């Protein structure tokens, strides 16, 4: 049998009158005897303080304060302590023989409130030889000791091996240890439990029937049915949570679209503005850089323009200075050209008239001769024509009768004969007998030459004849011409002078003929001289442009160098053009590629976002479309496996739920019908009787009763035999056992207990062997243990089922997401990153732009060098051909020499011009001067002979020509032979006729032509004479005008003058053109400089403004980025696909979202205000604040009982997965959690029956208690009538009130309260809520009325009240009640504490002198029977015979107060025995 724990001693350290006193406590009764003020109450106060160290409860009052409403301010504790550290310690030993010292350290706190500081502690493992006073005191000398502080006590105990010291910060922990170690009977979990315990101790201490206990006796005696209540609370909490969750799901379902809409629109609103600002910031940075580049370029351009302006202004000044002289020279050259042209025109007229006169003179002379010859020829022709006419007429008459025609042979014969005759005539005339037709052509050339020679000789003689004929008239004319040229001379000298003049005229004419070559030579030399001067000017200008003086010898080498430079630069320029074209082509290709990639980038980004979401959801990285499709197949397989596993877990969970429901039946009945049968038979279920069996005993009893563990125990089997007839609504096997349910035991069977098994001898010939079940369910503890394990398993299964359901739905949604991804993005998701390619291409584009700029600069420099080189080469090309001119130093001398020669030639030309006509007239008639008249006859003969020779030669040539012409006729010999005989006469006639007709025709024609010619010649002669006279007059006028002009007019003068004028005009035009160009260039340069200056000012202003804007925007942007990163929304706002939209598109997107958001947040004042503030375009961070506010608002709206995330976007995604599953699961859970009203009534009724039985058992222990006239004490328990009606309605008439219990708007407690109000409308419920009333109705203790009754004298049983009993009777009755309460607490706490511990039982009784000896003996007997310790305080006249008695005497010695204590053992029946150590007086010493 388990020994009960005992209090061994009480130790007081530094209390008022007790410095270090240990009271050994008796196992039964310890009596404190002493007079008033001896310290009895102080000792008990120290015990109570160590037992309940709660200053809110402790209140030590004396009997004079019993009716007072308030006691002393220190609650009676402050005044009982001495200054310094005080201790109160209880030394106990529990059922396990463990020594435990518990206590408190007390210390007065200075102040008018007289507070006390309490620190509880516990010491375990202390050896039995160590006394408590040795722990907390330190001996200084024989008469002095010091109290240790709590820290010093801890250090001291730490040095002791095996000793554990615990200090507690809460009273709950302190009492929890005392309960676990068996020091107190009840676990004091709360302040309410401590208050009950203190009220019990207080009632025990001061004695009597405590109204605080009797009024709430149900709370003390009836244990709280925590299991049932907890089950109801859990059920209602679960139902409430279930309904709240379902409501939350419904709210969430309604909010889901709002969430989506709000998040979507807020994201579009803020992200569009965020990305627009990001784009604008990038654009502004690019613009600022572009402004800066353009600013530097413009500054360079302005500097170049300024240098260019200075050069052009200097050059313009030079050209302005040269223009005046050029204009004067040009005007002089123009005037000279006009004079030369006028002179030339006059000279041309003169020459033309002179030529015309000469021609007219010749024509006139020739015409005179022609007219004379024509007249003679006319006479001859007339005579010849008449003779020919006569001959033709005669021949025609002879041939009138002859045949008129011949055939072809005759014609050929004629032609042959003519050819033969012509050949013969040629031989005869030419004296060539060997002449043949073949050699006729050669001879023809010879005779034609002879004819020509004879003709020339004839003409010469003819001329001489003519001269001779006119010699007389011409001699005088020739003489006059010689005299006009030479002056007067003798006639005999005329021939010699004429010849000399003709020779001199030839020389002069030769010199005159050299005028033009000399003039040309002079013009050429002058041109060369001008070219030399121009070359010198060009050389000077070239040296000036080159900035260096060059020698003539260096120009060729420089030309070659420049040519080579031009060639290289030309190649560079041409290659540069190709390179530039290639670069521009590549740039265009890059731009086109970038545009294509920018169009493709949003699609790719959307695909990547979808792919990243899939990767985040599945935790996999995909690198190809094949991996996606393979993972999709794996996903399908995983989904099938998860569905199978979920269904298996769901089946197991349902089985566990069914088993829990079966085990949760009241009374342990697995079948509801057993409860109805037990009520019908008036019995009790066996499992209900053994409901309190311990967990250790459950296997034994389960095996003992075997199948009959669900039997019904009835008082009498014979009374229910009739009820068994026709019984159908019952289990297949119904066990009935006869016995008293109030005193039933297991003696009905003969049992042999084996190892983990029993053998039950049911009858002599029937045994049953039953092993202990591994999982017993017999008894409430076993069922609760099994239910607890099943609940744990169910929680695991539920969690696993929820996880699997979540995984299944997640997998299904993931499968849908994969399907959408494959359908929409698979084709582009695994292509190369277009943004990386865009960055690479942009880098390449920047390189190309930089290369193009560098190339353009280099090309510009090369072009400039090329132009300079070309200009130099052009100048050298003009100079090089003139190098010899530049080197010719004698050119000017040669010009002077030629000028002198030209002057001589011009003098000769003037002579020829003056006497040329006379010389020309003299020359043909000069021979007249040498001829004399006597030579005329000889000339005549020579002329005749020459004429005959010429005629013969002409005939010979004619005959040979006829032979040559008739060479083809010599082949017609055959035709001649045929016609030779008969056609001779005819041929002759014809020949003569033909000759005559020909002659006649010639004569006529000649006559006509000569007649016409004669008339024409006469007319021409008249017109020539008239023209000659007119032009002679005009010639004289023109010569006078030419002399008036005074300009030498030669053939090259006009050309030289024009060339000079044109050169000067070209120079002037070039100068003016260059000046105009320079003026225009200067104007353009000044305008360009002004434009550049304005542009520079504008660029500087724009650059500074843009830079300030960039800097300002950077600060704002940094604040925005900091806010974005601090709130973790960058991933939501930085949507890269929006970077490819324009600012207008983003602004439109933001405005549309803003309009939608205004409607969405119209009902939310906070979001509406934040949205209104965010509309400020100058404060972009406010949009971020709005976005964060939206997220915070949505986080607050997220139901954390459904969605375990702070991210609203993830919450929406999880909602989609969770809502349908939770709705289905919670609906089924609500159906399972709901409990029927009948079950509630049965549970409450069974609990009431069980507690009534327990109270009856407790009453058995009170039957022998008697005090004075009180013979017995009992507890009376009854069910309240209103509550009994409620139970009946719940059991039998619940169908009438299903409107309450089936309502989803009411919890079960509220429905129960509504039913109670419906059944008892007369009861006023006050301000309590239905939930509170319902919870009270679920507590079975509220159904019971409990009161204490005493059997007193002749009054019989009456209610125990202090007014009806004497003081002693009331003290005894109250003490009896307290003992029963303690025993009830122990029974209640037995299941919570280890079974090997029986707690300590101790009560107090102050002022025990009011009890008589018989009553005190009754208390002693009660303590002995209940193994209870009792501490009583009594005056000195109390001397109990049993237990231990301490005599306390308070003494004062030298202003020092102390209590003298003497302890005595009980003296009956033994002699009194003095306890060791009790004779020594306590001598307090000063604390050192």
Curated annotation (Swiss-Prot):
Disulfide bonds: none annotated. It holds the Pfam family MukB_hinge. Residues 1049-1074 are annotated as: Disordered. The keyword Translocase does not apply. It comes from the Bacteria. Residues 1051-1065 have a biased composition (Basic and acidic residues). GO terms for molecular function: ATP binding; DNA binding. It is found in: Cytoplasm, Nucleoid. Residues 666-783 are annotated as: Flexible hinge. Keywords: ATP-binding, Cell cycle, Cell division, Chromosome partition, Coiled coil, Cytoplasm, DNA condensation, DNA-binding, Nucleotide-binding. Transmembrane segments: none annotated. GO terms for biological process: cell division; chromosome condensation; chromosome segregation; DNA replication. GO terms for cellular component: cytoplasm; nucleoid. Residues 326-418, 444-472, 509-602, 835-923, 977-1116, 1209-1265 form a coiled coil. ATP binds at residues 34-41. The keyword DNA repair does not apply. Homodimerization via its hinge domain. Binds to DNA via its C-terminal region. Interacts, and probably forms a ternary complex, with MukE and MukF via its C-terminal region. The complex formation is stimulated by calcium or magnesium. Interacts with tubulin-related protein FtsZ. Belongs to the SMC family. MukB subfamily. Plays a central role in chromosome condensation, segregation and cell cycle progression. Functions as a homodimer, which is essential for chromosome partition. Involved in negative DNA supercoiling in vivo, and by this means organize and compact chromosomes. May achieve or facilitate chromosome segregation by condensation DNA from both sides of a centrally located replisome during cell division. The hinge domain, which separates the large intramolecular coiled coil regions, allows the homodimerization, forming a V-shaped homodimer. This is Chromosome partition protein MukB. It comes from Salmonella gallinarum (strain 287/91 / NCTC 13346). The lineage of its organism: Bacteria, Pseudomonadati, Pseudomonadota, Gammaproteobacteria, Enterobacterales.
